[in-house]
Amino acid sequence: MKTNFLVLLSALLAASSAVTATLIPAKCKHEAFSQRAGSSLNAAIKSDGRKYFGTCADPGTLGNWQISNIIKAEMGQVTPENSMKWDATQPQRGTFNFGNADRLVDFATSNGKLIRGHTLVWHSQLPSWVSSITDANDLTNVIQNRIATVVGRYKGKVYAWDVVNEMFNENGSFRESVFYKLLGEDFVKIAFEAARKADPNAKLYINDYNLDDPDYPKLKSLVANVKKWRSQGVPIDGIGSQSHLQAAGHFLDASKVGGAMQALCAAASECAMTELDIAQASPDQYTKATEACLNQKNCVGITVWGVSDNTSWRKNANPLLWNSSYQKKPAYNAVLSTLNSYQA
């Protein structure tokens, strides 16, 4: 009797499930799947046809289990905040140190994350032995050797490289770095050609900050020069807008970033927001920034510059999506909602 009852109960449950499944329209099933697929920032942006939503990190921050768990759950891409910069990888001439960079790459690859290499040629965090070079041929060889060594080491593991970083002044002129002083703008060609040779499949970016207003001289100059260099055969694939934005109502807030991204993305094969953070993390400002990327079909992804406010380089501005207790802020919900509801 007990066996017959169990058989009957199983049959009733199976029938009930079948009826329920029949009554759920296909659209509802699809919506339920979409909501599950977009339950993280990375899943949501990929459902919009983009490549990644990411953040920056280094072995030190990855040692914080709360941050590493958030990255594993929410992010699809990692940028080394400092561990691939020149002072970290080649503090003395002829001596390379890849300990921290290797650890970052190992974390990313073992957890299925894309990597944006950052950065190859930059005037800051530059060892004194480089900044004191006075011979153009010597500097050319040094640039080529660094790029061949660093990019070559991670060939096939890095999605994109910030090849040249922050080379423009606010008025649009070229920054008077050691690279420009000795080589003029030819250092751009030298760097990008070396990177292409070292890893032909990596996407190569020029990256800068304060590119958040389409009428700003810095943005106009970068766009004009990228178009010129690309027409001359310099292998620039993408433009990275760091997107360190101010609070609403301040100069270079998110109010004009839509037009800025339109101008930047039109000048290259692809573009990205590479270091996004917004002072005070207004949900509305984060929504505007997110939409600015999504509105450009070749904007491949968004990288926020850190996970939690306590680890931000702008920590006093509380600019990130998680607070110092690793709790999601309203800005997080705004970004996720924007990604999930976006329609091209």
From Swiss-Prot:
Disulfide bonding pattern of the chain: C293-C299
Main location (coarse class): secreted
SUPFAM superfamilies reported in the protein's UniProt record: (Trans)glycosidases
An annotated GO BP: xylan catabolic process
EC numbers for this chain: 3.2.1.8
Ranges for domain GH10: 35-338
Glycosylated residues in this chain: N171, N310, N323
Gene Ontology terms for molecular function: endo-1,4-beta-xylanase activity
Active-site residues, Swiss-Prot/TrEMBL: E166, E275
Residues in coiled coil: none
Protein name: Endo-1,4-beta-xylanase UM03411
